[in-house]
Regions:
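Active-site-proximal flexible loops/turns
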Residues: 31, 62, 172-175, 207
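Metal-dependent nuclease catalytic regions and adjoining charged, substrate-binding loops involved
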Residues: 203-297
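Short acidic (Asp/Glu) and glycine-rich catalytic loops that position anionic groups and cofactors
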Residues: 31-38, 168, 220-226
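Flexible, glycine- and charge-enriched loops at secondary-structure boundaries
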Residues: 47, 190-194, 235-238
Length: 297
């Protein structure tokens, strides 16, 4: 177990992550406070939860669910059984109640299309690896020489010196029609990764040396993006992206050090974006944010 620097301990900041580097600084600080002082996390939404379910079904179908590098893969599950188990998990999700029914509506729509998307994911993983054996998701660590805590990472699938991350895009709502009904827009699989996705891949590449890949899945199919069709996933570009990630980690590190163990000092160093916070996390989290940022006064 690594030793946490003294200045980080009051904030419960024991590690960095790839996702943490792509998160706005104010939300990162808010997340630390909620976890350390309130024992809470940001509320979930139907969209990311549905993505987890798609991956869970794909994992079971390929025999890499609940993966352990010690015991290795298990027997692949029949697709129908995998879908059934995955959908049972999704039934436990409770939609948000503060967005005028948006999350509830999306939850019910996603229930209709998860099985189809999971099949696309299974097919895409199979195409990416072919006969190559691969591992499922488990906790890994990376130590950057300029950062005084390790980086925790979870790669979706790795094998044969290559890794691929599953990225799901779900339908979005169109405006209500005059008769009160609504249609949905079904996106095509992406052909280019977002800057945040490139940063995440850069961390994985730096930590493991695995060639990065992204498997984009929608209800319409899948598309695989890697260095063969995307310059942003080639080594020179990944190195540039990694340096951006490192710089963001350093910003957080310097802020925590400058705060001298006091939340009030930390809040005074960071300007909150209340509009982004309420839009992403709802009025309850906004109320917490407004309360804690008063501590800097």
């Amino acid at each position: 177990m690594h030793e946490i620097p003294v200045y980080r301990q009051p904030f419960g900041s024991s590690h960095t992550s790839a996702s943490g580097a792509t998160q706005p600084v104010d939300e990162h600080i808010l997340k630390l406070y909620m976890r350390k002082e309130l024992g809470r996390s940001f509320p979930f939404a139907a969209r990311p939860r549905a993505g987890q379910i798609v991956q869970s079904i794909a994992d079971m179908a390929h025999g890499v669910h609940d993966y352990s590098p010690i015991s290795g893969p298990t027997k692949p599950m029949d697709m129908a059984d995998a879908v059934r188990k995955g959908m049972n998990k999704f039934e436990f999700y409770k939609p948000r109640d503060w967005d005028n029914g948006k999350d509830t509506e999306e939850y019910h729509k996603f229930k209709e299309i998860i099985p189809e998307m999971a099949q696309h994911a299974v097919n895409g993983i199979r195409e990416f690896y072919g006969d190559t054996k691969f591992e499922g998701e488990f906790q890994r660590w990376h130590q950057d020489e300029l950062i005084d805590v390790p980086t925790m990472l979870f790669q979706d699938y790795t094998g044969g010196g290559r890794q691929v991350d599953l990225k799901c895009s779900f339908p979005t709502r169109n405006p209500l029609k005059k008769d009160g009904t609504r249609s949905w827009r079904f996106p095509k699989p992406r052909t280019e990764p977002t800057p945040q996705q490139i940063m995440q891949q850069a961390v994985y590449w730096k930590a493991t040396g695995d060639e990065p890949g992204l498997l984009f899945v929608t209800p319409l199919g899948f598309n695989i993006v890697d260095a063969s069709n995307c310059d942003a996933l080639k080594p020179h570009a990944l190195e540039e992206s990694y340096q951006q990630v490192r710089q963001r980690w350093l910003v957080i590190q310097n802020l925590l050090r400058a705060a001298e163990g006091k939340w009030s000092n930390l809040f005074a160093l960071v300007q909150p974006d209340y509009g982004q916070i309420v839009g992403r996390h709802g009025p309850d989290i906004l109320a917490i944010a407004k309360q804690i940022w008063r501590l800097d006064r």
